[in-house]
C-alpha cells in the first residue's frame, strides 16, 4: 500500500531564523502580508520582532489581532472578511495553535469560497485549491501547526471542536526560531510541551504508524523528554530542544494521525475552554495504560527514548509501566495537575464521551474503543 507523507516546502530552524521571512517573501513575489497574531503577543512585543523584519525590508503588511484561544467559526468568518478588505496576498501566522489554525482556515476559505460556512471543512475537507500562502512562525513549542495538515475550529453552536484535515492548508514556509518562544511563561511552556509529547507518543502507537513516522516520533520523544524541564526554566538549551522536538513530532503525526487522548481533550476545550496541552497531559498516562495491550513492544521504545535504564531486560509488564511512569514523572515535574477533578463535571460525561467518540482522532487509536469505555476513562480521571 502506498504511504503519503506531506511536509513544508521550506523550513528554517535556529536562533535568528525570522530574518528569513523577508528572504522568502521577496523570492516568492509576495506583495502584502496579512499578519495573524493574538493581542498578548502584540502587547508583549513578540509580534514586533517579525514586524521589524518586514519594516527593515520595506515589506507591506496589515496586522490582524482578533485571534481567540480555541478559535471559533465566527472568528474565522471575521478574519476572511478582514483579509479581503486589507488587499493582502499572503498570510504570516505568528503564535501558537490559535493563530495558526485561524490563518489556515482563512487561507483555505479565501481560495475555496464554497466552504465559507466553515463547518463544512470538518473532517477530511474536499477542497480543490491550496490555501493562500502561509508563512508560519510558532511562538510555542507544542502544537507544531506550522508543519501539519490539520487545524481545529470550535463550533460554539454545538459546543464541539471540529478537526479539519486538509493537505491544502500546510504552510509553504515554517520559521522555527527559539527566540520567538523565550517569553512563554512556565505554565504555557509546560502545557504546550506536554502537548508535543502527546503528539509524539500517540503518533508512535497510532493505527496508521509506519517506519518513516516511527523514526520521527521516537526522536521527538527523546528530544522532548531531555528538553522540557529546561525549557520550563527558560534555559537556551531547553528552548532550542523543544523548538526542534515539537516540530519533528509534527512531521510525524500530521501524516499518520493521533488517538483518543486528543479525542478526549478536544471536548474539554470546547465545553470548558480547558487549555489543550493541559488536557492532553492529564489524560495521556491513563489512556496509555488503556492502550497498552494493543501496542506490542512500542512502550519499551518509548521508555528507552525517555531515558529509562535497563529496558532491554524488562518484562512486557515492566516496560509498559516504566513508559507510563516516565510520562507521569515528567508531567509532575513541570507542574501539570494530576487529574480532571477541577475541570470536568460528572453530569457532562455522557456528552464528553460521545463527543470524544465522534472526534476525527478516535479512529487512529490503536485499541478499538466505545462510548462506554471512554466514559469510564473520564470517570477515572475525576
Residue ranges and their predicted role:
Residues 150-256:
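Carboxylate- and glycine-rich phosphate/diphosphate-binding segment that chelates Mg2+/Mn2+
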Residues 267-306:
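Catalytic phosphate/nucleotide-handling subdomain of diverse soluble enzymes
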Amino acid at each position: 500500500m502506498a504511504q503519503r507523507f506531506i511536509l513544508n516546502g521550506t523550513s528554517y530552524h535556529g536562533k535568528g531564523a525570522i530574518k528569513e521571512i523577508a528572504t522568502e517573501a521577496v523570492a516568492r513575489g509576495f506583495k502584502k502580508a496579512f499578519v495573524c497574531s493574538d493581542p498578548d503577543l502584540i502587547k508583549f512585543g513578540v509580534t514586533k520582532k517579525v514586524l521589524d523584519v518586514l519594516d527593515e525590508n520595506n515589506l507591506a503588511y496589515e496586522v490582524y489581532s482578533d485571534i481567540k484561544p480555541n478559535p471559533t467559526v465566527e472568528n474565522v468568518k471575521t478574519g476572511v472578511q478582514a483579509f479581503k478588505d486589507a488587499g493582502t496576498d499572503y498570510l504570516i501566522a505568528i503564535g501558537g495553535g490559535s493563530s495558526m489554525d485561524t490563518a489556515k482556515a482563512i487561507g483555505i476559505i479565501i481560495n475555496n469560497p464554497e466552504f465559507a460556512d466553515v463547518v463544512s471543512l470538518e473532517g477530511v475537507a474536499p477542497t480543490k485549491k491550496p490555501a493562500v500562502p502561509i508563512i508560519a512562525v510558532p511562538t510555542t513549542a507544542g502544537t507544531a501547526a506550522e508543519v501539519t495538515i490539520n487545524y481545529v475550529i470550535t463550533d460554539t453552536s454545538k459546543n464541539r471542536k471540529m478537526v479539519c484535515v486538509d493537505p491544502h492548508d500546510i504552510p509553504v514556509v515554517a520559521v522555527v526560531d527559539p527566540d520567538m518562544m523565550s517569553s512563554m511563561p512556565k505554565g504555557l511552556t509546560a502545557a504546550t510541551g506536554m502537548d508535543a509529547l502527546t503528539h509524539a507518543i500517540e503518533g508512535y502507537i497510532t493505527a496508521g504508524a509506519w517506519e518513516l513516522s516511527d523514526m520521527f516520533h521516537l526522536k521527538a520523544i527523546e528530544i522532548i523528554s531531555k528538553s522540557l524541564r529546561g525549557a520550563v526554566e527558560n534555559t537556551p538549551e531547553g528552548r532550542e530542544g523543544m523548538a526542534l522536538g515539537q516540530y519533528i513530532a509534527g512531521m510525524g503525526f500530521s501524516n499518520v494521525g493521533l488517538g483518543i487522548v486528543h479525542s478526549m481533550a478536544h471536548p474539554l476545550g470546547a465545553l470548558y475552554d480547558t487549555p489543550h496541552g493541559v488536557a492532553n497531559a492529564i489524560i495521556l498516562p491513563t489512556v496509555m495504560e488503556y492502550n497498552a495491550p494493543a501496542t506490542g513492544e512500542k512502550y519499551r521504545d518509548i521508555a528507552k527514548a525517555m531515558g529509562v535504564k535497563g529496558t532491554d531486560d524488562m518484562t512486557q509488564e515492566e516496560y509498559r509501566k516504566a513508559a507510563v511512569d516516565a510520562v507521569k514523572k515528567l508531567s509532575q515535574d513541570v507542574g501539570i495537575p494530576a487529574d480532571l477533578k477541577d475541570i470536568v463535571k460528572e453530569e457532562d460525561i455522557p456528552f464528553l464521551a460521545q463527543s470524544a467518540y465522534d472526534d476525527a482522532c478516535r479512529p487512529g487509536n490503536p485499541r478499538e474503543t466505545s462510548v462506554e469505555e471512554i466514559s469510564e476513562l473520564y470517570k477515572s480521571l475525576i
